[in-house]
């Protein structure tokens, strides 16, 4: 697929993952953990994760439009315009 056009997707980072947003983007966040970004057509979930330098050890659960994307499938899951990508770190407690 050509990467000559851009589409808008929403990225939601939960818990400490929000700390990985670049300082210049913090002002663009909505509702504290949500950021709308323009990405080239054909962008995969993994490319979005990589763009924000999210450490792989902290990327535990990824959903696109509420559907779980297994970690091994993030590189092959191509996003569409207006998709919502939600990322959670591992949950601890007891």
Describe each region flagged by the PLM.
Residues 1-93:
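Ubiquitin-like/PB1-type beta-grasp interaction modules and other compact soluble beta-rich domains
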């Amino acid at each position: 697929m050509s990467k000559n056009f851009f589409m808008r997707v929403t990225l939601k980072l939960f818990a400490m993952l929000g700390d990985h947003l670049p300082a210049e983007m913090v002002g663009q966040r909505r509702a504290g953990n949500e950021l709308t970004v323009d990405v080239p057509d054909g962008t995969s979930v993994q490319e979005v994760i990589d763009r924000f330098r999210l450490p792989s050890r902290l990327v535990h659960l990824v959903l696109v439009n509420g559907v779980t994307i297994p970690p091994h499938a993030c590189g092959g899951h191509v996003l569409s315009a207006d998709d919502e990508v939600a990322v959670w770190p591992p949950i601890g407690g007891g």
